[in-house]
Structures are given as structure tokens and as C-alpha cells.
Amino acid sequence: MKKKLGTSFIKLFAILVLSLLLTSGAKAGCDDAPTDGVDYSNCQFSEGQDLSRAYIPNSNLSFISFIKVTFDKGVMMNATLANGNFVESSFIRTNLYEANLEGGIFEKANFSSANLTRVNFKGASLIETNFTNSNLFEADLTGANILNATFEGANLNNAVWID
């Protein structure tokens, strides 16, 4: 009887622990579908993925590698893309309102017609980045490397450029 009771207790305990882990809001895995608040920090994704129209506001994409990935027409408001590698990625008409892109590498990225209102680009690498017709109202570009970037038709009202 003692052995049976002990085994039942262990099974019950295991079920309880497993259910707590599943309902605790644990960090998302790198294979999880894009959604609001997902945490992909430190994940590596294959080159050339198409994540157009992805809805990932409030998500953590920091310390991530997304080389040549398409995020066109996506929603990434309040997302964190800090210290990520987004070389040659496309953000055409993407909504990045108040996103944190601090220290990220966005060389040759395309932000044409993107909403970059109040975006934090502090210390980011923006070499040959395309901001044509984008909205950079109150964006913070302090200390960013902005070599040969294109700002034709962009709204730069109240943007911060201090080194």
C-alpha cells in the first residue's frame, strides 16, 4: 500500500509541476509562430525568410540574427530589436512605433514608408539604409552610424541626431 501511495504521489507531483511550467508564460521557443509578445531573443533564423505582415508587437527580438528577412507591412510596435543583426532585411511599410532598435545592425536594410515614430536607433549601424518616405518623427539616432543612408521624403521632425 505504501509503495502504491508513493507512486501516486510522484505522478501527481509530476503532473502539477508540468502544468505549472505550461501555464507560467514561459519564454517562447525559436520555432514558435510569430504573435503578440513573443520572445525570440538569441534565436538564429535562416536567411531570406518571408515574415511579411507578421503581427509581433511587444515582442523581444534582441540579440537575434535575421539576415535578408522580409518584414514588409508587419506590425512591430513597441518591439525590442536591440543588438540584433538585420543586414539587408526589409521593413517596407512596417509599423515600428516606439520600437527599440538600439545597437542593432541594419546595414542595407529597407525602411521605405515605415512608421518609425519615436523609434530608438541609439548606436545602431545604419550604413546604406533606405529610409525613403518613412516617418522618423521624434526618432532617436544618437550615436548611430548613418553612412550613405537615404532619407528622401522622410519625416525627420523632432528627430535627435546628437553624437
Model-based region annotation:
Residues K11-T23:
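Bacterial N-terminal signal peptides
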